[in-house]
Amino acid sequence: MMTTAMATTRVRLGSEQLLTSGMLKNKRVGIVSNPASIDAKFQHIVRVLAETPEVGLAAIFGPQHGFRADVQDNMIETAHASDPSRGVPVYSLYSETREPTAEMLKGLDALVVDLQDVGSRIYTFIYTMANCLRAGRKHGVPVIVTDRPNPIGGDTVSGPTLVKGFESFVGQFPIPMRHGMTIGELARFFNDTGGIGADLTVVPMEGWQRGMYYEDTGLPWVMPSPNVPTVESAVVYPGTVLFEGTNVSEGRGTTRPFELIGAPWVDAEALAEKLRTYDLPGVHFRPVVFEPTFQKHARQACGGCQIHVLDRREFRAVESAVAVLVEIRTQNPSAFQWRQPPYEYEHDKMPFDILAGSSQLRHQIEAGLPVRTIYYSWLQDHERFHIERQPFLLY
């Protein structure tokens, strides 16, 4: 399943570059981070900043799931708090406040964003970053984004592209489901093409290459959110996250979120047998029965499949997930349902459409279009995006 040999020399993170650059000397700094904001020695950036005498740590900001990443699900907000050991406020940016306010930024010389993305359009951390850029522009605070690896690589672009009118907190910009960019590259892309215009500095990594998966970087993996515990979760996530828009479990409440897909009314053997006829590259669908401990179908035995990625470079996460969805819907027409609003604070649009970036994919599935035809319908947008993103790539 590994795509290349493990790195013999590790990638040097943007946060490590920042802390040795002197850029923060004699500055009052705010930091947007969570438990994955560590360096190669597992040192957290908040601790390092707090222990650096020439840097004044003045505020901490947390994204979705909280600064401690202890909150499980979507639309469960975290409250503002304080860090008694450091005497600084801890502001939640997944609450009634999504964008830092003037009061939160008061007195700051810079706002640093050090977040680990997972490589999918719908992951909210990149929009928390975008909101920080907007706040920095409004209130005259420079924003520094310390770059981190895209854990699923920077070469592949896949899945449907967000269409205007379907923006939400899981999609603010017209990018494909799997965008193949680092968080620093996305900052540059959003700031320019989104017309934000913040005073932005991206501190690049050293040694990262676009073909790398996270294991190739030589860096320790810390789960950026509760339901992306492993790199394997991140690899399948751009596709199987679509099941959040249905009444089928995406494996939350199990030890394999986004790899296990199913529901109490799914025949696991029949599903896997049919999926094998698709002959999709780089993947095996194994029939399983699992019991989620929470969320959809909690404490119920669910039939379904586990998605085993055999070759990451051949695997097509979104096409594979659409195939699973199509077959579950076809085999269980009376039981399968599209999830109804609200979802991520959108009260009118269908949750599946918000995730997919438009209503097109849902309509294609309902019309019975072949999965391969659906896949080919994305390719023109991918070609355009490759051209659009090129000026903003750092590696």
Where do the protein language model's features map onto the residues?
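Conserved functional hotspot residues or short segments at active or partner-binding sites
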Residues: 262-375
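Glycine-rich, charge-decorated loop segments at or immediately adjacent to ligand/cofactor-binding or catalytic sites
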Residues: 69-73, 144-166
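Conserved anion/nucleotide-ligand pocket segment
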Residues: 166-240
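Glycine/threonine-rich flexible loop motifs
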Residues: 117-129
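Glycine-rich oxoanion-binding loops at beta->alpha junctions
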Residues: 73-108, 120
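Glycine-rich, aromatic-lined ligand/substrate-binding cores of catalytic
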Residues: 208-293
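N-terminal phosphate-binding or glycine-rich loops at protein starts, especially the Walker A/P-loop
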Residues: 9-55
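Short internal beta-strands
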Residues: 56-65, 146
